[in-house]
Amino acid sequence: MSQTKTPLRGRLAARRSPDSGRLAGPGSLLTSDVGVVAPDAEGQLLAEYALEHGLRPSAQRPSVWAYIRQLWRRRYFMISFATARNVAMYTEAKLGQLWQVLTPLLNAGVYFLIFGLLLHINRGIPNYLGFLVTGVFVFNFTQRAFISTSSVMTDSLQLIRALQFPRASLPLAYVMIELQQMLLAVAVLIPILLLTGEPVTWYWLLAIPALLLQTIFNVGVGLLSARLGSQVNDFSQLLPFLMRTWLYVSGVLFSIATVSSNFKVVALLELNPAALYITLTRNALMATQRESAPGSKPYNKALCNIWHTLGHKKGAPEKYQTLSAYCHYVGANPAHFWYYAAGWAVLALVAGFWFFWRAETRYGRG
């Protein structure tokens, strides 16, 4: 025989309070006759009854794989959202979308004026303009992804509270916005490299996997930044200082390989993820970097001494600047840079996704 479900009213009556005291007043009644149910027990009973009839909490966190499938189904929404935000970002400016390219160009120009012409940090670095612009554009991609995602959850509270969707789609869409801007920056970077004498080679194709690894890394740190920004009120105040420090230790303005003779210092700086993606992109697009990197040619003490003596002088000919290739390499093994970059990308993606997913039901509350 099939088992019939007890009606909700019958269950509540079965769980009435065991209190047998009498109520004051004429015609006294036992509280057991009234059937009082403890509030906690009543809530638990209602939850059990709802589950039996197929009802589930609206803000229940899905499993990891179910969450990934939800994100994949919304991939077109994220692409459309990113494109629309990119178009709307500069609608009120007279130059419009040109600011997407002008902003990193102006930053690179300021850095070149200060560090290249005034402080002469460019000594010993062939094609310093191309070196600097490449570093600024690549670092700017990660920096903007980190900063923009830090406020995405608080800026989208109305959307989060009104609709049910995987919250990770918001920071992912913002990373897509920065990726679209990075592609525009690359379209500007290539003519600059050609004008500064860099040849077109098959090595340029290596910039594609370098950009892909950096994008994966940015997704991970974007998810991490999104949760921290939504739960730590002072996080947005700390970000400018963190980003400025990260800029100065990532080799954007100088060559890490020649900054110190201490192996541990150089290796630590080179294994910084931002520095890795910058180095991989420079080595892919700039022949001057591949040919002048210390250790790229057999060690020659005499030529290395000439580089240390003349290559750092202001206005030194490029033939002296490229002699650094004959010096010993100090730091991490350049042949392993791709492995390090891939490791950082996977680590950031897995850790960032798990960290964000754990708080899926908390976004939009407060």
Report each predicted region and the residues it spans.
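Hydrophobic transmembrane alpha-helices and immediately adjacent juxtamembrane helices
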Residues: 2-18, 22-366
